Amino acid sequence: MSSQEASKMLRTYNIAWWGNNYYDVNELGHISVCPDPDVPEARVDLAKLVKAREAQGQRLPALFCFPQILQHRLRSINAAFKRARESYGYNGDYFLVYPIKVNQHRRVIESLIHSGEPLGLEAGSKAELMAVLAHAGMTRSVIVCNGYKDREYIRLALIGEKMGHKVYLVIEKMSEIAIVLEEAERLNVVPRLGVRARLASQGSGKWQSSGGEKSKFGLAATQVLQLVETLRDAGRLDSLQLLHFHLGSQMANIRDIATGVRESARFYVELHKLGVNIQCFDVGGGLGVDYEGTRSQSDCSVNYGLNEYANNIIWAIGDACEEHGLPHPTVITESGRAVTAHHTVLVSNIIGVERNEYTDPTAPAEDAPRALQNLWETWQEMHKPGTRRSLREWLHDSQMDLHDIHIGYSSGAFSLQERAWAEQLYLSMCHEVQKQLDPQNRAHRPIIDELQERMADKMYVNFSLFQSMPDAWGIDQLFPVLPLEGLDQVPERRAVLLDITCDSDGAIDHYIDGDGIATTMPMPEYDPENPPMLGFFMVGAYQEILGNMHNLFGDTEAVDVFVFPDGSVEVELSDEGDTVADMLQYVQLDPKTLLTHFRDQVKQTDLDDALQQQFLEEFEAGLYGYTYLEDE
């Protein structure tokens, strides 16, 4: 593939921007993965890797996870803050604290811990805190405890502090502080406290409700003052060491981030005036990733990079400290999405394709109903040289005629054959109009979009949107989706992707199309009998954890892929995926009981013994098989 062709494909799918140097198109037109862009020779052809794994028994759909990307993301964020601190002359430290709610899988937590980079962990529930405490011995860093807390949660955090860990209990509700002080006294431990301030500043987009004055968590200004006085009265004011705020997840606009940090810096200054020695400034989450590759303020993009993000935070805090003669605090960010999103690709196979095929139309019978004659006359006029009717007018006329035919069919005025003829002719007319449209003509764009959606191939993909990409369904989040091969060809076709659940919501509605978003996906020409595998990229944050069991489709298989500079690749199975039996047990349906009931029914039939045994074996094999479709 020429460099010009490769460049065109990169632009079509915006790989150069959302891929962030981890994903590219190689000379074969295949997706290649470079888990560590600092070691460019260490890369793998993803299409070849998947096919090799399939030959060894790998089932699809499957998650292909690249732990080296996790580690590179962690290094990159740490490096950005190091550069920002050096540029400003900032004296405080920086810690990235990973909120495990983003992806609690062991492979993710341990890959980050073993990176050799400074790393803290954040918990938002008792279960998460137990996981964090169990891994804390490997980090010897910071633990931040957020979320609603009961007595057991608080005791666990204080036990961690008693064991020598640096555990910050962030007060998010005034009711928590009394329990903290009681349990700290019982355990004879000095608590290390934080306070989450509820800011007026708020981001925009799909996650804006997690920040601002109406947010679920945090203390208002009057409550912050009340907390300070409560601690002062208890002789524990020195325990309040961390200031925390959260603007929202996936902040698209750097100006919103800068505004929020400046407001929170005022809290830092005012708390020092009250005698509170705040040592850590936790700016929470918000560091976004560019799912679209548009470098914009849209909900699924960001208009900044790591360096600009780090600079805005360090300079805002540093300026506030310099203005008021205060020490530079340790800066903490809870950057889970930015660390994990890129490292996982869901790969699946297309199990069926429904294409709109075009045939040379034939004239209707002379005595055909008027609506059929009108449709045919429009078709003939489209092919007359010098016609002055617009493309839009042709399209509208044909749509009206087809609408009349559909209504007439319902009342018995048209036969099934006549309806089929009309629909096929209409498709041919749409195809003819589509060929004459100019994408550079702004007036044509609405018609192009309408026809692309109408004429797109329907691809039925072996996956559950609700299990593997729940945010695409729940909040209409966009994820990069494209074939793993065939990217050396011009994307002349369009497609929409449908999952295998029995739900009309199981469809992807938005796709990357150059610098914009479309309702259909660009596709290179392909063999409908042997369609390419598809990759769903950047699904490493939240998707595995939020996935649900709609239609009892379970977790997919997952493998960890390690790529080395000499070209060698190591693949480890990290999750075998759920069986049908696993999913049935989730809903209190015991597989053994079901098998017994089925056996009893089979025995009551008049089938011969051999056939009874065959059916029993098939039923039992299905119970312990994959929940997704499998090849024979």
From Swiss-Prot:
InterPro entries: Ala_racemase/Decarboxylase_C, Arg_decarb_HB, Arg_decarbox_C, Arg_decrbxlase, De-COase2_CS, De-COase2_N, De-COase2_pyr-phos_BS, Orn/DAP/Arg_de-COase. One of its GO terms (biological process) is arginine catabolic process. It holds the Pfam family Arg_decarb_HB. Pathway: Amine and polyamine biosynthesis; agmatine biosynthesis; agmatine from L-arginine: step 1/1. It comes from the Bacteria. It catalyses: L-arginine + H(+) = agmatine + CO2. Substrate binds at residues 281-291. The modification N6-(pyridoxal phosphate)lysine is found at residue 101. Its cofactor is Mg(2+); pyridoxal 5'-phosphate. Its EC number is 4.1.1.19. GO terms for molecular function: arginine decarboxylase activity; metal ion binding. The keyword Metal-binding applies. CDD domains: PLPDE_III_ADC. Keywords: Decarboxylase, Lyase, Magnesium, Metal-binding, Polyamine biosynthesis, Putrescine biosynthesis, Pyridoxal phosphate, Spermidine biosynthesis. HAMAP family: SpeA. Catalyzes the biosynthesis of agmatine from arginine. Belongs to the Orn/Lys/Arg decarboxylase class-II family. SpeA subfamily. This is Biosynthetic arginine decarboxylase. It comes from Salmonella paratyphi B (strain ATCC BAA-1250 / SPB7). The gene is speA.
